[in-house]
Amino acid sequence: MGQKINPHGFRLGITTEWKSRWYADKQYADYIKEDVAIRKLLATGLERAGIADVEIERTRDRVRVDIHTARPGIVIGRRGTEADRIRADLEKLTKKQVQLNILEVKNPESVAQLVAQGVAEQLSNRVAFRRAMRKAIQSAMRQPNVKGIRVQCSGRLGGAEMSRSEFYREGRVPLHTLRADIDYGLYEAKTTFGRIGVKVWIYKGDIVGGKRELTAAAPAADRPRRDRPSGTRPRRSGASGTTATSTDAGRAASEGTVEAPATEAAATAPSAGQPETTES
């Protein structure tokens, strides 16, 4: 199922984290609906900004929105006018105070969402889909942290009557390995022949020290021990079948049994003042 499922959801809690962080009891459905509306608002108004990810965090009276973008100048606007407009729209939507953080993406060629968006923009500009896919793969593989990439396009490719899917892959993309750091992006290109879906998987190596591996690699001293009952049976060595004791009393008892023949021999031996008797 690693070939079908979303890589982020498949590794959630293992190598990836939640993109919405908050707790709610009775307002759970309302908050989810609000999160979807926030992401839709940012996606529709900022198509050219190159938004890679949106993280939402809630407190009692405040909503924090982190926007990861490759073009922060478009999101901020001249003298911050665009950022103020976005903040006002979000406060009107959530009816709470909104803290807006705009974060720049350093390497957009290694972010799957931005790669998919770039391929989709080329398809909308009537660039051949194979050329766009190969160009995206070449630019991504030049990044030092990228170990493998897979790009897939689905739809009426080249204006064909029947839709199909084609993909190109370079390097390793282990979709079944849970410790693998796989970035996934999806974007739709609007063309004259219809919509073409673009999916991108980028493999950035294995994450050593995830939640499960840290728990499994915990030192033995930190793990809870089971208390042995006081009346345990003595251990037996497998070779001779003798009983092995580890207490001081057991050691003394074993030493006493070994030294017993020597004391008996000393008791039967004649003393120095008594003559020895021999039988003729």
Swiss-Prot record:
Matching SUPFAM superfamilies: Prokaryotic type KH domain (KH-domain type II), Ribosomal protein S3 C-terminal domain
Residue stretches making up the KH type-2 domain: 38-106
Signal peptide: none
Entries under InterPro entries matching the protein: KH_dom, KH_dom-like_a/b, KH_dom_type_2, KH_sf_prok-type, Ribosomal_S3_C_sf, Ribosomal_uS3_bac-typ, Ribosomal_uS3_C, Ribosomal_uS3_CS
Skewed-composition ranges (Low complexity): 237-270
UniProt keyword annotation of rRNA-binding present: yes
Gene Ontology molecular-function annotations: mRNA binding; rRNA binding; structural constituent of ribosome
rRNA-binding recorded as keyword: yes
GO biological process: translation
CDD domains according to UniProt: KH-II_30S_S3
Pfam families: KH_2, Ribosomal_S3_C
Annotated region described as Disordered, given as residue ranges: 216-280
Subunit field text: Part of the 30S ribosomal subunit. Forms a tight complex with proteins S10 and S14.
Known role: Binds the lower part of the 30S subunit head. Binds mRNA in the 70S ribosome, positioning it for translation.
The protein, known as: Small ribosomal subunit protein uS3
Source organism: Mycolicibacterium vanbaalenii (strain DSM 7251 / JCM 13017 / BCRC 16820 / KCTC 9966 / NRRL B-24157 / PYR-1)
Lineage of source species: Bacteria, Bacillati, Actinomycetota, Actinomycetes, Mycobacteriales
